[in-house]
Amino acid sequence: MKKLTFLLVALAANPAFASEGPFVSLRNAHFVILVAFLIFVGVLIKFKVPSMLLGMLDKRAEGIKADLDEAKALRDEAQKILASYERKAREVQGQADEIVAAAKRDAQLAAEQAKADLKEAIARRLKGAEDRIASAEAAALKDVKDRAVQVAVAAAAEVLANQMSASDKSGMIDAAITEVETRLN
């Protein structure tokens, strides 16, 4: 590589390209530039600048490759994490759907139970109302009967008072007292 570079430089510095006078002269600007360039290239080669440049380029390429590998590893890890989160999200969604379905079932059962309880309460209240009505009817009948008995007794007492004599009244009172005594004993 070094020889090829030197050969190209030497061919490029052909005396035919010189502008004036002999080519190998310090007065010829092209010759001076050629010599300076060759010295510069020689110094670069002496201090191993091309190998240092190649080493730096290789090092940079390795750094870029390492960065790319790290980026690929991070991308793979991110994809794994994303897949994990998506799986967890599906599981959570499934659990949420199950919870909602269970809540709907529970609400339906609670509504049915409330309807049954309401029907039972209405039936109890109707039964209680019917019992109160029957009791009120019985009380009214008793009151009517009692009043009828009172009226009948009063009417009978008046009829008897008008038709009975004092001795008959006294005999009836004695008979009633005797009957009460026998019943009490």
UniProtKB/Swiss-Prot annotation:
Membrane topology, record value: Single-pass membrane protein
Subcellular location: Cellular chromatophore membrane
InterPro entries in UniProt: ATP_synth_b/b'su_bac/chlpt, ATP_synthase_B_chain
Alphabetized GO MF terms: proton-transporting ATP synthase activity, rotational mechanism; proton-transporting ATPase activity, rotational mechanism
Propeptide residues according to the Swiss-Prot or TrEMBL record: 1-19
GO cellular component entries: plasma membrane; plasma membrane-derived chromatophore membrane; proton-transporting ATP synthase complex
Main location: membrane
Keyword Transport listed: yes
Keywords carried by this UniProt record: ATP synthesis, CF(0), Hydrogen ion transport, Ion transport, Membrane, Transmembrane, Transmembrane helix, Transport
TM segment ranges: 29-49
Keyword Transmembrane helix: yes
Subunit structure: F-type ATPases have 2 components, F(1) - the catalytic core - and F(0) - the membrane proton channel. F(1) has five subunits: alpha(3), beta(3), gamma(1), delta(1), epsilon(1). F(0) has four main subunits: a(1), b(1), b'(1) and c(10-14). The alpha and beta chains form an alternating ring which encloses part of the gamma chain. F(1) is attached to F(0) by a central stalk formed by the gamma and epsilon chains, while a peripheral stalk is formed by the delta, b and b' chains.
Family: Belongs to the ATPase B chain family.
Described function: F(1)F(0) ATP synthase produces ATP from ADP in the presence of a proton or sodium gradient. F-type ATPases consist of two structural domains, F(1) containing the extramembraneous catalytic core and F(0) containing the membrane proton channel, linked together by a central stalk and a peripheral stalk. During catalysis, ATP synthesis in the catalytic domain of F(1) is coupled via a rotary mechanism of the central stalk subunits to proton translocation.
HAMAP family (UniProt xref): ATP_synth_b_bprime
PANTHER family in alphabetical order: ATP SYNTHASE SUBUNIT B (PTHR33445:SF1), ATP SYNTHASE SUBUNIT B', CHLOROPLASTIC (PTHR33445)
Full protein name: ATP synthase subunit b
